[in-house]
Every structure is written in structure tokens, then in C-alpha cells.
Amino acid sequence: MPKPGIMDIHAYVGGKSKVEGIAHPVKLSSNENILGSSDKAKDAYRNAVDRLHIYPDGKANFLRAAVAERYKLEPERLTFGDGSDEIFALLCQVYLEPGDNIVQGEHGFAAYAIGARACQGEVRMAKEVNHRVDIDEVIKCVDERTRLVFIANPANPTGTWLTGEEIRALHAALPPSVVLVLDGAYAEFCSDPHFEDGLELARTAENVIVTRTFSKIHGLAALRVGWGYAPEHIIAPIERIRPPFNTSIPAQEAAVAALFDDDFQDRSRALVEQWRPWLAQQLGGLGLEVTPSAANFVLATFPTTPGKTAPEAEAFLASKGYLVRAVGNYNLPHAIRITIGLEEQNRAVVELLSQFMGR
């Protein structure tokens, strides 16, 4: 029999990628990079095919040195995962005993809770205000059994963000025994001058880890590469239990190439910065409530009127070949999340939703 509670965990459900009767739907359901991947990363991936019979470097030293160089970090304070999801799970394994708890926002990313519950930990959901993490509510949830506080900044699936000042205030209010996990999967898309990526806080504090991913702005979601930066006393136990060959040779090579492809990153960021406000404005004009976003997607809240609901909107768009994400499993039953697409895709989504809303 599995451990108590394992079969009570709701498995992670990703964005839909197929729709019956439509051969090639437009996928705007998983916050992938709509531009694809860096050509330099693709070349690096192809150049690695002659080494498929070789185990990868378990310490990912080539990638480690590249990330350290790019972000001016100490290489010994880095860990690498099969996506940043694996790092979240490893943190839970390192820090949680049965009955311990994690704290996250009420609309927080599902992987945090899955990792905690797999370790027989409890999950405390802090109330959010306007889909935004409220640091006072987070602090209220912390008690003597709290071991980890997970904050995605910007957040998924809402797109909201906290300023550097707010993150520092939250950290200052936490007991030293609680590790603050700052998930920066979408950090590259945030242009707010008051936003901070958390790396400096992780450099100076004893209980902060920042995680990043190559899945979003770098367009390498299929390769599953994430990294974390923290004090060595946090990294060391993760390294003790981390699977030994968890990032493949092609993944490491492609990630290094992507990391230094500034042109691809700039184009990816520019597309989002151009079409995110446009899409938000257009959806607002249809009578939908759009949450301010600093990520590569927008969250739109629909009426509860039969025929105009979020699940019905998701189904309508799918019937026309456009896949978006209803987020009822994130305690947002009236909302859908839409990845920023190419111009023609964004315009098509607005036109279809205009039809759906009867405008």
C-alpha cells in the first residue's frame, strides 16, 4: 500500500494540447514561448546527439559555470533540476516531516502542494487580495511547524507580482527556521522597476532560495531544466538526495546556448510586452475582468451567467482550434488563463471571445 495521503493528492494537470477533430490547434494553454526555441539552442541540442550513450555530468558543471557567469553567482551555491518542479519536490523532501507545513498563496502553483503532501506535509493557503499574495496573510499562516514558504514572483496562474520591498518585508517577518522559496519562472517578463528577482536576497540571507527555469523565456520546456540558488547549507542536502543524472547532455548544452542568446530573449520579451497590454485591454472591453499581469499570459474572469462562464469559454475556443486554460483547480472557477501568442493568434482569440460574449 502507498503511504497515507498519497492517493489523496490531486495529480498535476497541464494545459490541454489536443482537441478532437482539429489537427493542429493553437496552444495558448501552458505559457510556452510562442516563438519556439533559440536557433543556437537547437544547434547545441543537435550537436549533442553523438553523446546519447554517455551519462551526463551529474553536477552539470558546464551549465553551472554558465549560470554562475551570466548572473554573477557562486557556482557552489547552485543546484539543477529536471525543471524547477523537481527542486520544489526536493526541498519538501529535505525539510518536511509528517505534520510540518508549507505556506503558499491560495492561488499558488500546484507543484508546491503536491511536493508537500507527498512528504505527508500540510498545505496552508494564505488569502490573496485581488489575486495578489498578501504578505500579512502569509505571515498569519506561519506557525512553529512551518518549514517552507513558496512565493511565485510573478505568480502563476494570476500573473501578479510583489515588489522587492514587499519580498524583503516578508522575509524579515519570517522566523529564521523557515525557508523562503522564490519561484522566478516568469521573472524575465516583469518590467516593473520596483520588481527584484530575489537573487541578492538569496546571496545575503541564510534562509532564501531562488529558483528559475529554462521553460519560459528560453523556450526549452521539453528539455526540463531548472536551477536554484541558495546558501550552501540549503544546497548541500538537496545535492545529497538529488537524482544523479537529472539533466541530460542535450538539455545542458541547449540551456547554455539559450542562456547567452540575448537576441532571442529580447524578441520573446518584446512580443509579450507589446501584446500583453493589448490583449488585456481588448478583453476588458468585452466586459471581462483582467488581472494585471507581469508574466507571458493574462488571467480573465468571466461572468457566472449560464452561457457566458469560463469553462464554456474554454470549450468554445477549443471548438474553434484555440486552447486556453480554465483554472478552476487553482480556486479560480470563473477564470481562464491565456498565453500571449503571435499577433494573429491574439487577434483571433479576441474576435472569438467577442462572438462568445455576444458583442
Swiss-Prot record:
Catalytic EC class: transferase
Catalytic activity: L-histidinol phosphate + 2-oxoglutarate = 3-(imidazol-4-yl)-2-oxopropyl phosphate + L-glutamate
Pfam families: Aminotran_1_2
Pathway: Amino-acid biosynthesis; L-histidine biosynthesis; L-histidine from 5-phospho-alpha-D-ribose 1-diphosphate: step 7/9
Record-listed N6-(pyridoxal phosphate)lysine modification sites: K216
InterPro entries listed in its UniProt record: Aminotransferase_I/II_large, HisP_aminotrans, HistidinolP_aminotransfase, PyrdxlP-dep_Trfase, PyrdxlP-dep_Trfase_major, PyrdxlP-dep_Trfase_small
Coiled coil (UniProt feature): none
Annotated GO MF terms: histidinol-phosphate transaminase activity; pyridoxal phosphate binding
Enzyme Commission number: 2.6.1.9
Domain of life: Bacteria
Key words of the record: Amino-acid biosynthesis, Aminotransferase, Histidine biosynthesis, Pyridoxal phosphate, Transferase
GO biological process: L-histidine biosynthetic process
Swiss-Prot/TrEMBL cofactor(s): pyridoxal 5'-phosphate
Family: Belongs to the class-II pyridoxal-phosphate-dependent aminotransferase family. Histidinol-phosphate aminotransferase subfamily.
Subunit structure and binding partners: Homodimer.
NCBIfam families: hisC
Protein name: Histidinol-phosphate aminotransferase 1
